[in-house]
Amino acid sequence: LYFCTRYKHQMSSLPEKRIVDFISEHHVLTLATSFEEEPWCASCFYVYMPEDNCFVFTSDFNTRHIQQASHNIYVAGNIVLETSVVGKVQGVQFQGIISQPQNEQYEKAKKAYLKRFPVAMLMDTHIWVVDVTYIKMTDNRLGFGKKLIWSKDIALQK
């Protein structure tokens, strides 16, 4: 672990519990995509699978963010706690790689998503996952501007 005055940086297979707990307590993320110098953001209902460190969400093929992701799999996003109290500000910014899960991963992701959002059973949509590679969490409850940073060892992906 690397420490400095405002940042705590961790490089391991999974983020620390405070980050996982924050992500797990929420259900809407903003997903940012881009292609040919055209950025886009989309709000997505998600479920987080901490054991795989990935977000699961549904979206149709014809949406702008999925169209862009089909050309550029590198995405970013955020999850934020809305509050006007500066001392309670919390949020996560992340980077990751988007894909359609296959086989066992698909079944696991679908089961997790439908458990959290059973109404999705009524919709004709597609499951997507974002394999998280970087997280920066701001948590002012730990001190103003306190950041917790996690990075995936990219060598593990190869």
Please state what every model-predicted region is:
Residues 86-158:
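Charged, gly/pro-rich active-site loop segments
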Residues 26-61, 69, 75-81, 90:
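Short beta-strand segments
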Residues 2-28, 155-158:
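Extreme N-terminal tail/first-helix region
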Residues 23-24, 70-71, 114:
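Alpha-helix boundary recognition
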Residues 24, 39, 120-123:
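Short solvent-exposed loop/turn micro-motifs enriched in small/polar/acidic residues
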Residues 20-21, 47, 67, 118-120:
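Short secondary-structure boundary/capping segments
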Residues 27-28, 74, 118, 135:
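Generic structural signal for secondary-structure transition and capping sites
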Residues 59-63, 76-81, 107-119:
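Short acidic (Asp/Glu) patches
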